[in-house]
Amino acid sequence: MSGNTYGKLFTVTTAGESHGPALVAIVDGCPPGLEISLEDLQRDLDRRKPGTSRHTTQRQEADEVEILSGVFEGRTTGCSIGLLIRNTDQKSKDYSAIKDLFRPAHADYTYHHKYGERDYRGGGRSSARETAMRVAAGAIAKKYLASQGIVIRGYMSQLGPIEIPFKTWESVEQNAFFSPDPDKVPELEAYMDQLRRDQDSVGAKITVVAEGVMPGLGEPIFDRLDAELAHALMSINAVKGVEIGAGFACVAQRGTEHRDELTPEGFLSNNAGGILGGISSGQPIVAHLALKPTSSITTPGRSIDIDGNPVDVITKGRHDPCVGIRATPIAEAMMAIVLMDHLLRHRGQNADVRVSTPVLGQL
């Protein structure tokens, strides 16, 4: 199986399955001398881990990360950073009834046709359990980017039909939904409680923002920064759409509305989402992710078995009724990994570039 590594100068390779003994990651390319601790990584892992509220899966994983290499006396050495998270709460027997069936809208059917073999326990490699390692690796990238003045934060901007207006960043960390509007939390809780009673699931929209990014990151033509972000964010389980800036709303805009005009004081808008011609403009980089409703629900669904016979499938086990609730730190991690990679690439080729034009912010 290929496709387990992302990046060119800052690379992240992950391995492990949902019900295997552990998840592992190798992070290469981190500059030496970065102060890093287990707490730096654990902070984001705790934001993602399961079982933290009644609105997420009740699988109880501590997600305690171990640093195996690449860090000595609290500082990165420049060598490969090895990371490990042990799985501790697998209940593989929950999946024995579906080992010869294909769950609708899961990767069971496609993995079977591609490999001829599949780990049916919790989806194996296709499970979102893998994203714990992305969050751990992304925490390293976030720590380095922060030292360069770059801050990456995300929030839930929609759950099912409920749109969530942005109010404050402080509110995001004070509820289980990563909602920036505390007044919306009771409505979100009531909606999720009813959803659970209906034995159904729902999708969500996540917004992730990077502030403090200097102009110049991104490599035309095929490694445009927005293309790389879309690639990385689309690689997250259940993501079915990515928008940069105004995204699909630009279809209804006129050029006079959409263009981000410049003044000596700064940009007048940010419809481009901080990226022009595939290169960062110095404005905040803004991306939106659409996550589908999980198909792991107890309502029966039609499918087939490995012999092609029709069956009704009821998915047992412990699942998120809305995978978007825990997706915010994952989206932050993937944006951080992309920006870290491009920062190092930009520095390698363009470190000596100097222009007299001032860097503009947004009014």
UniProtKB/Swiss-Prot annotation:
FMN binds at residues 125-127, 237-238, 277, 292-296, 318. The keyword Lyase applies. GO terms for molecular function: chorismate synthase activity; FMN binding. NADP(+) binds at residues 48, 54. This reaction introduces a second double bond into the aromatic ring system. Its cofactor is FMNH2. The gene is aroC. Homotetramer. It catalyses: 5-O-(1-carboxyvinyl)-3-phosphoshikimate = chorismate + phosphate. Gene3D superfamilies: Chorismate synthase AroC (3.60.150.10). The keyword Lyase applies. Pathway: Metabolic intermediate biosynthesis; chorismate biosynthesis; chorismate from D-erythrose 4-phosphate and phosphoenolpyruvate: step 7/7. Reduced FMN (FMNH(2)). It is an enzyme of class 4 (lyase). CDD domains: Chorismate_synthase. InterPro entries: Chorismate_synth (IPR000453), Chorismate_synth_AroC_sf (IPR035904), Chorismate_synthase_CS (IPR020541). Belongs to the chorismate synthase family. Keywords: Amino-acid biosynthesis, Aromatic amino acid biosynthesis, FAD, Flavoprotein, FMN, Lyase, NADP. This is Chorismate synthase. PANTHER family: CHORISMATE SYNTHASE. GO terms for cellular component: cytosol. GO terms for biological process: amino acid biosynthetic process; aromatic amino acid family biosynthetic process; chorismate biosynthetic process. Its EC number is 4.2.3.5.
